[in-house]
Amino acid sequence: MSRERVVTPKAGEEDQQIEKSLRPRRLAEFIGQEKVVEQLRIAIMAAKGRGEPLDHTLLYGPPGLGKTSLAGVLAAEMGVNIKLTSGPAIERAGDLAALLTNLQKDDILFIDEIHRLNRAIEEVLYPAMEDFALDIMVGKGPGARSLRLKLPRFTVIGATTRLALLTSPLRDRFGSVHRLEFYSVDALYQIVMRSARILGVDCTPEGAHEIAARARGTPRIVNRLLRRVRDYAQVVGNGVITLETARDALAKLEVDHLGLDDNDRRLLRAIIELFNGGPVGLSTLAASLAEEVDAIEDVYEPFLLQLGFLQRTPRGRIATRRAYEHLGVPYVERTIDNGADQGRLWS
């Protein structure tokens, strides 16, 4: 399951290069996430009216839904600079201090994967976010003293796929917290048509809708599928993405009508065939698939849970009736009786 997946929500190098040209610049261009966008629009207008920076903002949700894009839009709407970094990239307190001291008034510091900040870094970030001050230790031993350096007022925008891993003190310092949801097919259709115009791709509404329907509710995936179908249309067809062209291309990519690929189906089959439908522990499931536990939780599970193909229980993962039906496997009715035998077959 380690080969590159066309439906993975995580960004590859090609995605990062292309996404820069496809990202919206303003809130008016941002498609989907209507509730979040409206709340942020009000926050921006209020902050501008008071002449203050935005409240510290936390964006969370599955990967590929536009957290980084939204941070860039907020910076553009506020007319300020944005500095991009990530939790793993800030290894020492000095790294964070260098970032903070280079910020100008009202600037935005965007920290992706903020849940991966280590605790020592968080201790430096707390007073910076709360008091706009940086505490620096000068000297060593008994003569060491703390020096407080004032910082210009700024905004931290944090992004995470794992809200539960944030410590309470860090989470409490964000005045604005927003969850990004999976996109509707209609919203993804609009994204396909917009991206096709930017990339100079001739795409029919029917072809765009077919791509949108298989994109797992994720803009990053819909843009990647658009590029793959474009390549197919250019080589096999006449360069136009029609309904038939889109279906043929996506079939060759092994992306079915719900957006599942061979890796998703293999995961579901493992639960059904190797573990009798579950429950199976996460680490056991990951080992059987030669996958990382984090990849199962962050990449595979969110969409399968959204479809209702998977259940998380205290005893492990269970494949639902819908998963059996999608794979064309006869469903085995089961009961779970406090550790007693499971998997009873009912006639």
Curated annotation (Swiss-Prot):
The keyword DNA damage applies. Keywords: ATP-binding, Cytoplasm, DNA damage, DNA recombination, DNA repair, DNA-binding, Hydrolase, Nucleotide-binding. Residues 257-347 are annotated as: Head domain (RuvB-H). Residues 184-254 are annotated as: Small ATPAse domain (RuvB-S). GO terms for biological process: DNA recombination; DNA repair. It catalyses: ATP + H2O = ADP + phosphate + H(+). SMART domains: AAA (SM00382). Its EC number is 3.6.4.-. Mg(2+) binds at residue 68. HAMAP family: DNA_HJ_migration_RuvB. Belongs to the RuvB family. The RuvA-RuvB-RuvC complex processes Holliday junction (HJ) DNA during genetic recombination and DNA repair, while the RuvA-RuvB complex plays an important role in the rescue of blocked DNA replication forks via replication fork reversal (RFR). RuvA specifically binds to HJ cruciform DNA, conferring on it an open structure. The RuvB hexamer acts as an ATP-dependent pump, pulling dsDNA into and through the RuvAB complex. RuvB forms 2 homohexamers on either side of HJ DNA bound by 1 or 2 RuvA tetramers; 4 subunits per hexamer contact DNA at a time. This is Holliday junction branch migration complex subunit RuvB. The lineage of its organism: Bacteria, Bacillati, Chloroflexota, Chloroflexia, Chloroflexales. The gene is ruvB.
